[in-house]
Amino acid sequence: MADYIRARSAEHKAERIEEIMNASEKLFSEGSYHNVSLTNIAKELGWSRANLYKYVDTKEEIFLALYLKKQEKFVDCLLEKYNGREDVPDEEFSSIWARAFEENLEYPKYQELQHSILETNVEC
């Protein structure tokens, strides 16, 4: 196991969260979301699960943070392509959306998973 030193400052905590996000994203991209566990994430980081729990409570929390990051990147891409224009011809509209998806290939996967996760983990 890697030498683990608990982050104390806000800056170090942000670095730890970024490490968690990167490791989780790698694991989510390599296989099924449902096959990834906090144990797998901790192992990928070289940490114990107890150390991981100091920063996150659930796998869903990590996933939703990644999803929001992907969503923000996708929306920013769309806004950049629209460049403040409101009246865009249909053909250009389709082209803008197609290019935005091409530049953000992971976003649709995360969006689909997000709906599945919410349906599975939220009771009405």
Spans of model-derived segments:
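Short, solvent-exposed secondary-structure capping/transition elements
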Residues: 61, 75, 109-110
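Generic hydrophobic, amphipathic alpha-helix propensity
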Residues: 13-24, 41, 66-70, 74
